[in-house]
Amino acid sequence: ANGQQMQRFGSYDLGAQNLQALAAADWRLAPGWTLLGSVQWSHLTRDAQRRSSAAQLNQDWSFATPKIGLNWAATPTTRLWANLSRSHEAPTFWEIVSATVAPNSPATAQAELVRLKMQRATTIELGGAGRWGEGAHAVHWTAAVYRSVLADELISTTDANGIKVGTYNYAGGTRHQGVELGLSGSQRVGTGALDVRASWTYSDFRFRGGEYAGNQIAGVPRQLINAEVLYRMGAWRFGPHVRWMPVSTPTDHANTPGAEQDAYGLLGRKLEWRDGPLALYVQADNVTDRRY
């Protein structure tokens, strides 16, 4: 509070390396049907050395991520697909270097290095994309449903003040599943056109076992809706956009009653100028000054 410099408590030299190799192939099984397969091999390293001592933590992971998919061109304007894949996610330095800073006692701040496993997942996805109509005023749509079963998910925790406490691998297993829908199009109105874009996501992310078995993973909105309606005249577009979270979201993994983030809706405005690949815009979010 008096402007004096605090002690340095987390000074590290960090080094990362990513090596990857990919092989992919596709086979046309029949008119409109294509089978796709790929496998990616990765080797990642994350090294951290504390500058003020000999403390260090060097970690590396090697893994393969296969994927197989089937595409069907149902019509000239409609494509459907099914995918089965494995994925891996290595921890970041933000998760490996864990800092503890008490708001009412910053002089006791400290940092430590945390050894973490890779997060692994198996995912199945069904989806489709297409359009209704032709030309510049066609309506485009996308839809997908997915389910992922995860092991050793990287879970972050915070204290009652919202300060990050740390990250660890959740041993009880987790599950991510949901639905994603998107719609976009343009319709002529007067001397210009009305560009519409909307998306809806439904996310059911839960702990499968362990301490929080059955609970919703904190901070992941169960439903989220984004939409914008922009009127276009020449190179200019302007109009409103909306971000709406229609249901409350838990803020802790224990799903404590009364500790949820309440549902909210935010209204914004956007002004955009576009000329070929160049675009400039001014955007104002939450123009109604809603607290959320």
What is the meaning of each model-derived region?
Residues 2-74, 90:
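Signature of Gram-negative outer-membrane beta-barrel scaffolds
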Residues 25-28, 62, 70-74, 86, ...:
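Residue-level signature of outer-membrane beta-barrel architecture
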Residues 73, 79-85, 95, 115-179, ...:
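Membrane-embedded beta-barrel scaffold of Gram-negative outer-membrane proteins
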Residues 28-35, 44, 136-150, 167-252:
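Gram-negative outer-membrane beta-barrel transporters
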Residues 11-17, 58-63, 115-120, 171-177, ...:
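Short sequence motifs at beta-strands and strand-loop junctions characteristic
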